[in-house]
Each structure stands twice: as C-alpha cells, then as structure tokens.
C-alpha cells in the first residue's frame, strides 16, 4: 500500500476521535454562536454522550466562561429586538421555549430595552404604513406592549414636527 492509498483509507480517523470527546464537540458548537445551557445539554445528549460526561462538560465550560445563560439571553434579546424588531413579549416567549430561567429572561430584556433606541428604527418603518393605526397593529403583533407603542409613536410624531 502506497502513501496515497493509506492516506485515503485513514482520512478523518483522527478527526472522528476528537469529535467523540464531549468538550471538543461542545466547543465546536460554541464556535459558531453563543448557546444556552439547556440547548447545549440537549445537543450533547443527542450526540450520545453519557449524562456524567455531559454534566462535567457543562460545568467545565461554565468555569471557563464559555457558557453563560445570562449573557446569551441578553445577546439573544438584543438581536431579536434590534435586528428583527420583535418586542419584549415575543422575545420572552422565544427565550422560554429555549429553556432559559424566568429571572434571567427579565434581566436580559430590561438590559436590552435600556440599550436599544426603537425611535430611530421605527422612523424608517413609518414610511411603509399608511397611517398610525397600521403601524400600531404591526408593533402589537411583533410583541410590543400598548403603553410602549404609544410612547414610541408619540416620540416619533413629536420629533418630526
């Protein structure tokens, strides 16, 4: 057997051995995006790792700072609100479905709301709608509370006059 046949035969064997380790697999998943603890636990179990291995991996990642539900929830809320223009109600539902703790969700949404300026985002949106009511309905469907909608619309209307 020459070198090229041997290489073809053994291609990926070392890679597969590395992929079998739960910590390496978890780090590979975290390389692409921030993940929640429950989400990572499910992925590791689905991959076939034992419960003890999964828990020790998650503990290790928490100690090293790679796994932080609070930071992940904040970044998720910020992206959903700023980029996709979802309101706090929809973001809360999405985070609950991902298995995030209620307290963490509340803190993340509060922190994200402090940082986001919806007025600038919605000024651009206003041109798409015929009147104020259409924009109000759109925002309500996107998960904004009626009091927040009124506050935002009043600031937008007041800023243009």
Curated annotation (Swiss-Prot):
- Among the entry's GO cellular component annotations, what is one? cytoplasm
What does the organism's lineage look like at the top?
Bacteria, Thermotogati, Thermotogota, Thermotogae, Thermotogales
Pfam families according to UniProt? RecX_HTH1, RecX_HTH2
**Quick one: which gene encodes this?**
recX
Q: In UniProt terms, what function does this protein have?
A: Modulates RecA activity.
Keyword annotations for this protein?
Cytoplasm
One biological-process term from Gene Ontology?
regulation of DNA repair
What this protein is called in its record is Regulatory protein RecX
Q: Which residues does UniProt assign to the signal peptide? A: none
Q: Does the keyword Cytoplasm apply?
A: yes
| UniProt similarity note | Belongs to the RecX family.
The answer, when asked if Cytoplasm is one of the entry's keywords, is: yes
**Where is this chain's protein located in or outside the cell?**
Cytoplasm
